[in-house]
Amino acid sequence: MSTKYTHLFSPIKVGGTELPNRIAMMPMGVFSPRLLDPKTGAYTKDGADYYIERAKGGTGLIVTGVVPIIPMPGKNPVNFPDEYVEKMRYLTEGVHKYGSKIFIQFTAMTGRAAHITNEIEWKMLPAPAPIQNVWDPTIQNRGITKEEIKKYIENFAQAAYLVKQAGGDGVEVHAVHEGYLLDQFAISFYNKRTDEYGGSLENRLRFAKEIVEAIKAKCGKEFPVSVRYSVRSYVKDFNRGALPWEEFEEKGRDLAEGIQVAKMLESFGYDMLDCDNGSYDSWFWPHPPMYMPKACNLKDVQEVKKAVNIPVVCAGRFDDPELAEQAIEEGKIDIMGMGRPLLADPELGHKFYEGRLEDVRPCISCHQGCLGRIFQGRDISCAVNPACGREKSYALTEAEKKKKVLVIGGGLGGMEAARVCALRGHEVDLYEKTDHLGGVFVAAATPDFKEDDRHLLAWYKKQMKDLPIQVHMNTEVTEDMTKGYDEIFVATGAKERKLEIPGFDSPHVTYAFETLRDGSIQIDGENVLIIGGGLTGCEIAYMFAREGKKVTIVEMTETILNAFGLSAANYNMLMEILDYYKVKVIKNAVVEEFRDGKAIVAETVKNYPNVANRAKLMFALGPQGMKVKHEIPADHIVVSVGYLPDDRLYEQIKGDHVYLIGDAKRPTNVMDAIWAAYEIAKDI
């Protein structure tokens, strides 16, 4: 079978190794002991199976997640060379079985970006020179010594040699990228050394230069060495990232220096530049949420490609084979890099080759199953693919006994339950009381930055058509209709929480679901007030602010964006967006009344002397602080205060083999709904 993506599926040489196609799996951290041996730093069989599954699916190059080579106990191949080589052969042989190649990524670790834990003390993870920690600015990471630098370089070379012995095809140096240690050395904003590793750009890159020279000396010139590389930093200041559309003064690496560094990395002997953008101070660039444009790094990476003669990879919300084919054909890049999309669908390579794009299960850039779980110290996985990282134990098998399964509700949880049961051979009926599938997710997917949510919804609808599932629309299930089924999934969703507030019977008050479902509520006037500073409320605020409205968020607690499972990358970008659009946030406050185009807001303020002058009215001082009333102009109010489970039918029929899932059990997020359905359905 031929493919229309002839450039994407053409071979390419990296150093002395030829890749079968131009699709590369990008490195993502795999730290849990179930996937990465805490002693040797070799991948366990579960960890290896995770990568092998992507090779099986048609990925040409696998680049593994970071493995430390720093002089510390455990997770260091150099300390256990024979054991490491033996364990790694299962991975390399498994990847080669499908014709793919594999590079193992080694890291000099995080420097100032270290999470300080009981296991990893701050003194173990030095920065180039004393500097404030990313996560706790009250802590200063110490400066690394020259003796330590020498040891790091030796360990990189020795670890690379072990990979070669284990049958690996190359290594990747982590990283002049994302504000990790080598990147901190490379950028003057972070590197304040005064010796030969600081000052000039040549000095700041000396560490990266000596690493590749040592690897080549140990493994031979033909042994491929890639480097993970962030072209631009997009840093406004410590812990302040720049948005794609804003003008700012770059504190990190700008594009001109990024091109210069790329040329120097090539001259040092690196065989491939694995490119993205960003830093820990602009974390939403290396880990782009749905608010980022698609292929957000391509415009910068293509400038690097013009300047070098080694293969260049581009990653970052880059999941469109049409765009990749065009970019490769036009010489803008050499290789399409994907991370999260391959977690969501490990068969991407084959589906791209065959042109089956509608069968691709999309990444929705939520970070809940991948980055979020990594930073909780848990296994890497995926919100829309529960089997990710558990390829063998979560693999679907044919059911020993075929059963009649009833699924009540056609939201994501209900459709996932129906899909899995049908794949396992059960007889499935799905009932949906409305005229559409998707439940509240239909409204959530409405904003233009949620295109992948809409793709996921379309994918589920296609599964319902392609699989032997009887779908009954516009039908509300009663207790009598549940008779005769062996297994029942109750996925009846949730009801929006309503507020009883004077004036809220106005047509100028809408709830989040209605506001999103209708696409865009037409508002006469410029002032919009959002009640509720959760994820949905803040995204609605963004939508209206982008239209030029003056937006105020009223939140009853002390924090906004306190959403279950929200990753730091998504949080940071949305907070920067709200700040950029000057969205006003009033915390510890409630709306008491809406009248005459104004909302009466009662705010509890502890620092009351600074607020008294801007208050219209004041209450008596209470034990928690002073209560201040504001009159906030509001031409329209959107209420976004969450949902309440709709478990009424479940309460009528609950018993053995009746499962309450999704928002009907607990309104949370996409991952919870899909995972709960999968984990039950895979075993019945």
Give residue spans per PLM region:
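Conserved beta-strand termini and adjacent loop/short-helix elements that scaffold enzyme active sites
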Residues: 315, 385, 474-476, 512, ...
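Rossmann-like dinucleotide-binding cores of NAD(P)H-dependent redox enzymes
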Residues: 427-467, 543-591
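Rossmann-like dinucleotide/flavin-binding elements
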Residues: 402-431, 472-480, 484, 491-501, ...
